[in-house]
Amino acid sequence: MSIDPINPTPIPPPASSGFSLANVIFATLIPTIIIVAVAGYFYITAIPENPGNLDFQIGLADRVIGDRTKLSEAFTDANGDLVADTPSDASKLVDPEKLLISHVASADSIEQAKKWQPLMDMIQKTTGKPVEYVILTDTNEQLSYFKEGKLHIAAFNTGTVPAAVNLTGFVPYCSPVTTGSTTGYQMVFIVPKESAINTPADIKGKTLAVTNVMSHSGYKMPLTYLRDEFKMYPGKDYDLRLSGGHAQSIKGIQSDGYEVAAVASDLLSSIQNAGGIKEGDYRVIHRSDTNQPAAPWGYAYNLKPELQDKIKQAFDAYTDPKFQPISYAKDWDYIRKVDSAMLNWNSK
């Protein structure tokens, strides 16, 4: 049985008999599900599950980076911090009656809404405005929402931040403190506990599970690392499987569905602490030397300055977790270099 590129451990619906409202709803939704599945098929095949080396290299930059590496001409950056300036024209400033917020788009967005309710309460307290969580499961959809003003406050995954800054006017402000007084995580390669794969060099001839093409630790960083350190290219020296997310990659390793996966260490720890995987279920065969910045929270560049300040006050006062202010120009320098390396893929 082949592994589904989106769900490595598919679980069939439980068998049932007799009439039930759920069965009726299920039956009426079949045509819709088919349409969505077909659309999803064409989306997935636009980024091949096991891309041939030549086609992969030719299309890599456009698929992953495209025009996302430079600040859009719609914005200005007078102070050179690489982030869109707040408009000087008062008519271009917004002061919404209700603040719309969303954490990193993921399959567990509903659970994230519950997790971040205390933060929303804090923001409501400091701004005096009601705060509503927007459920989003797709990164590109989250980018679109932010660009269209359907989100005012958000956290984007580390690899998506440059696109959010350059295309949508996202202003990163802070990242959660993960250990002691530090923020961030490492990219790790993990394998099933009984795997014969012991080093990154052993990935040659194997299949690497990656999360999605916008992910830094789940896609861009591992591919550039294997290329630069071992001259290994996907589609030529090893194959790829798109899992759809870090949690899916980790579950695939736990069930022996994947040979090796690239994931973020903080998400691995979080899932392990929640009982989703045990330490004895996997082994880490490589951990990146550099500490990657954790997914940052930020706000829209065109919010009124006084509203921006009140939002910052909420993050500064919040303690579970604590947040640490970040510098996009400094802290995302390495991420931007990886993006540049992807753009110059064929030159290596």
Question: Which residues does each PLM region occupy?
Answer:
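A ligand-binding cleft/hinge motif common to bilobed small-molecule-binding domains
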Residues: 155-168, 225-228, 252-255, 259-280
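Extracytoplasmic
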Residues: 96-98, 118, 126-128, 141, ...
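Bilobed "Venus flytrap"/periplasmic-binding protein-like clamshell domains
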Residues: 101-124, 159, 179-251, 260, ...
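Periplasmic-binding protein-like
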Residues: 104-105, 179-188, 276-312, 325-345
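Conserved functional loop/turn residues at catalytic and ligand-binding sites
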Residues: 150, 207, 257
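N-terminal hydrophobic or amphipathic helices and topogenic motifs
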Residues: 2-141, 323-348
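Short beta-strand-to-loop elements that line the ligand-binding cleft
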Residues: 130-137, 234-245, 283-287
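Acidic, polar ligand-binding/catalytic clefts
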Residues: 45, 143-202
